[in-house]
Amino acid sequence: MPKESGRKVVATNRKARHNYHVMDTYEAGIALMGTEVKSLREGHASMVDGFCTFYNDELWMEGIHIPEYHQGSWTNHAARRRRKLLLHRDELDKISQKIRESGFTVVPLQLYFLDGRAKVEIAIARGKKDYDKRQTLREQQDKRESLRELRERNRR
């Protein structure tokens, strides 16, 4: 069976861009078990509570829910286990330096397959305040209304 080419998105963290100001993004590989890969290929994953932390100078992703593979037996994985992210040392150093600054965190944005390999897009982000979230929603609503008015004007 030939490897797939291109990018197949499995899961996205839609709340991440709502709750955080995204500064930098990185692409990282993930150390997964076989049943996790099979479950991901079926499109099963949830990134709602996902976050990344450093342990022993390595970046780990937590809170991601990959359900057990339905045809797996006793070899199945734990659904909410910690998963190691695979990055170059210089990227890890840059990320850890940014995290040491106050207010920055690392959040996963997207989980996908790229040329047959599972990847995750992570971002260095700063948390939004409540008034920032309301302002963003207001801007999006104004943009939608202006597009709607423009569409109605063009119909006439």
Swiss-Prot record:
One GO CC term, this protein: cytosol
MF GO annotations: RNA binding
Database matches in CDD domains: SmpB
Gene Ontology biological process terms from the UniProt entry: trans-translation
UniProt key word RNA-binding: yes
Annotated keywords: Cytoplasm, RNA-binding
One of the Pfam families matching this protein, by short name: SmpB
Main location: cytoplasm
Signal peptide: none
InterPro entries with a match to the protein in the record: SmpB (IPR023620), SsrA-bd_prot (IPR000037), SsrA-bd_prot_CS (IPR020081)
Function: Required for rescue of stalled ribosomes mediated by trans-translation. Binds to transfer-messenger RNA (tmRNA), required for stable association of tmRNA with ribosomes. tmRNA and SmpB together mimic tRNA shape, replacing the anticodon stem-loop with SmpB. tmRNA is encoded by the ssrA gene; the 2 termini fold to resemble tRNA(Ala) and it encodes a 'tag peptide', a short internal open reading frame. During trans-translation Ala-aminoacylated tmRNA acts like a tRNA, entering the A-site of stalled ribosomes, displacing the stalled mRNA.
NCBIfam families tied to this protein: PRK05422.1 (NF003843), smpB (TIGR00086)
UniProt protein name: SsrA-binding protein
Organism: Paenarthrobacter aurescens (strain TC1)
